[in-house]
Amino acid sequence: MELIEKHASFGGWQNVYRHYSQSLKCEMNVGVYLPPKAENEKLPVLYWLSGLTCNEQNFITKSGMQRYAAEHNIIVVAPDTSPRGSHVADADRYDLGQGAGFYLNATQAPWNEHYKMYDYIRNELPNLVMHHFPATARKSISGHSMGGLGALVLALRNPDEYASVSAFSPIVSPSQVPWGQQAFAAYLGENKDAWLDYDPVSLISQGQRVAEIMVDQGLSDDFYAEQLRTPNLEKICQEMNIKTLIRYHEGYDHSYYFVSSFIGEHIAYHANKLNMR
């Protein structure tokens, strides 16, 4: 991995690395925050998945997470949201193509050549992190919007791999809302059964489980009713007896002003779970 940015932050280092991804067949950037304790010992990892139009920079520059990661001794890994490059398929819209990988493995041309974000986040990136950084095998996952969807899907499909999962403003029923329907039709085709593998509410209804789900949702979020549908997640978790910590916040929107207001509580939540054995 090639170091391309290095910034001192709260006694540790906020770095950005570039590497070639075998899964995605392109160069990828990834943000890695190494807290002070990483100089002397191995630490657990929190993976953060960002939302539509984002790259590795949004979370590391806007959330203020470094203060809390340093306090709780957690390495934070923030990858890009899709494969990148002039040779990678793209679309003339913000919610499909580069910047909108939806953390799935595409099966339809032209997307299936590069868009394997599920494999990248689940397998390739953790292996790289374990190899290049002082990381233990303990990991948790979180994300915002499309990234919250990705975090929930990865945790629900691989419950033994993640100590905990949380999300800000996640797309919980993508097969039922425009963002998800448009992306899934392009990436996965018209067989809607394939869509359900990347739909948190559907996965839970089929019996997939995690110990607990933490979600924060702003009630002044313009996408709340049409695209996000947080109550759908709350309802299915109640029906399937999955413990939740779902909090609704008056006045908060879909932006990083919202994420930065509560990211400290999410990192503390994950730190507690990561340190349990």
UniProtKB/Swiss-Prot annotation:
SUPFAM superfamilies tied to this protein: alpha/beta-Hydrolases
Catalytic activity reported: S-formylglutathione + H2O = formate + glutathione + H(+)
Give the active-site positions. S145, D221, H254
- EC number(s) in its UniProt entry? 3.1.2.12
Q: Which UniProt keywords apply?
A: Hydrolase, Serine esterase
Q: Does the keyword Hydrolase apply?
A: yes
Q: Which GO terms describe its biological process?
A: formaldehyde catabolic process
Q: What does this protein do?
A: Serine hydrolase involved in the detoxification of formaldehyde. Hydrolyzes S-formylglutathione to glutathione and formate.
Q: Which family does it belong to?
A: Belongs to the esterase D family.
Output this protein's name. S-formylglutathione hydrolase FrmB
Gene behind this protein: frmB
